[in-house]
């Protein structure tokens, strides 16, 4: 029986360690307090606050598609944004122009850009580079406009909250050269993994979950958060409200069947956790229960098979971001100019033969 318990706790530790290693970052998103991050209706429509201030975000709307001919179902959404913003520059980036942009301005990333298995990953990453290079507002093609976006231009960085937790990358506004986006593009090569399911691969490597992980780490930087706050738009400003800036049309098509299963698991995580432990115990019992004889007690040192995933030396990619950060506020303040997100990394990276 002692040996059965040993194997049980051994495999339990293995599973828990692997779970924390792979999903520790996303799990922590459920515990984020958004209170200080929210961009509310009263904030945006209080014209007295910003009547004498210049816009932080340039008047540019960016969208991406394979070619210049977008699907008919999104023409109305595109037209609504163009018609409401005659004084804005509108840019539709195609697959060809996106790759040319990366090859010309960020050649150090071109190999990684070409290696992504899904086109949506390239569409994800290029929006980060575009907003960093030019600034402006990025909108997915299924996002239409209900009203002028001028009030949002006074906020140097804003995104929208997504469900069940974290932020989305389908609607974003950033000032040119925003340091948060610099951290985003620097971390892209470190999150480039294939999770064998299209939805998970996209979400973790380039999509909203990846962006949320970087944002979560960014919020913990005293200097970065104080100087370059990222505002999170409340749902009332996004859709289904008379205050909403946007209207969502028929959605994108890259979500495969695994997406629905992932969302179902997220909404019923407690049940799946219980069933997982129950199944694991039953399997271990039937594999070892009748075959093993009572064994001597396992020493405590023999049970430490894996190092803690919370260790500072852990290779977990959810913690890789912290090599650029410090938790000491005084230390950060004395070296703010030399922090990676304050350095001119673009010029530096183009002279290097390897990814950052």
UniProtKB/Swiss-Prot annotation:
Question: GO CC annotations?
Answer: cis-Golgi network membrane; endoplasmic reticulum; endoplasmic reticulum membrane; Golgi apparatus; trans-Golgi network; trans-Golgi network membrane
Transmembrane stretches in the record are: 4-24, 197-217, 269-289
Which InterPro entries does the entry mention? Answer: Glycosyltransferase_domain, GlycoTrfase_DXD_sugar-bd_CS, Nucleotide-diphossugar_trans
The broad enzyme category this protein falls into is: transferase
Q: Which domain of life is it from?
A: Eukaryota
Kindly state which keywords UniProt assigns to this record, in alphabetical order: Endoplasmic reticulum, Glycoprotein, Glycosyltransferase, Golgi apparatus, Membrane, Phosphoprotein, Transferase, Transmembrane, Transmembrane helix
Residues listed as glycosylation sites in the UniProt record: 52, 146
Q: Does the keyword Oxidoreductase apply?
A: no
User: EC number(s) on record?
Assistant: 2.4.-.-
Q: Which Pfam families match?
A: Gly_transf_sug
Query: What is the protein's name according to its record?
Result: Inositol phosphoceramide mannosyltransferase 3
């Amino acid at each position: 029986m002692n040996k059965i318990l040993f194997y049980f706790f051994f495999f339990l530790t293995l599973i828990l360690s692997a779970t924390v290693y792979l999903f520790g970052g996303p799990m922590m998103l459920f515990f984020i307090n958004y209170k200080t991050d929210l961009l509310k209706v009263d904030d945006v429509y209080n014209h007295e606050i910003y009547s004498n201030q210049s816009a932080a975000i340039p008047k540019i709307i960016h969208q991406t598609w394979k070619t210049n001919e977008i699907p008919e179902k999104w023409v109305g959404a595109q037209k609504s944004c163009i018609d409401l913003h005659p004084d804005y520059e509108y840019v539709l980036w195609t697959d060809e122009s996106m790759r040319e942009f990366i090859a010309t301005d960020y050649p150090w990333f071109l190999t990684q850009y070409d290696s992504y298995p899904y086109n949506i990953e390239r569409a994800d990453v290029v929006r980060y580079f575009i907003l960093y290079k030019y600034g402006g507002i990025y909108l997915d093609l299924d996002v239409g406009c209900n009203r002028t976006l001028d009030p949002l231009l006074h906020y140097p960085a804003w995104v929208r909250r997504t469900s069940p937790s974290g932020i989305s990358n389908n609607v974003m506004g950033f000032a040119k050269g925003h340091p948060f986006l610099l951290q985003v593009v620097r971390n892209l090569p470190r999150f480039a993994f294939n999770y064998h399911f299209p939805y998970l691969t996209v979400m973790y490597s380039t999509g909203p979950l990846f962006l949320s992980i970087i944002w979560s780490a960014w919020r913990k930087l005293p200097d970065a958060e104080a100087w370059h706050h990222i505002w999170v738009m409340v749902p009332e400003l996004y859709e289904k409200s008379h205050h909403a800036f946007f209207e969502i049309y028929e959605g994108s098509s890259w979500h495969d069947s695994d997406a629905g299963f992932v969302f179902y698991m997220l909404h019923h995580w407690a049940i799946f956790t219980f069933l997982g432990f129950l199944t694991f115990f039953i399997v271990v019992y039937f594999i070892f229960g009748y075959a093993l004889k009572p064994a001597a007690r396992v020493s405590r040192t023999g049970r430490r098979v894996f190092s803690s995933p919370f260790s500072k030396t852990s290779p977990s990619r959810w913690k890789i971001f912290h090599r650029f950060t410090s938790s000491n506020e005084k230390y950060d303040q004395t070296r703010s100019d030399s922090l990676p997100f304050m350095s001119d990394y673009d010029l530096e990276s183009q002279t290097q033969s390897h990814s950052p």
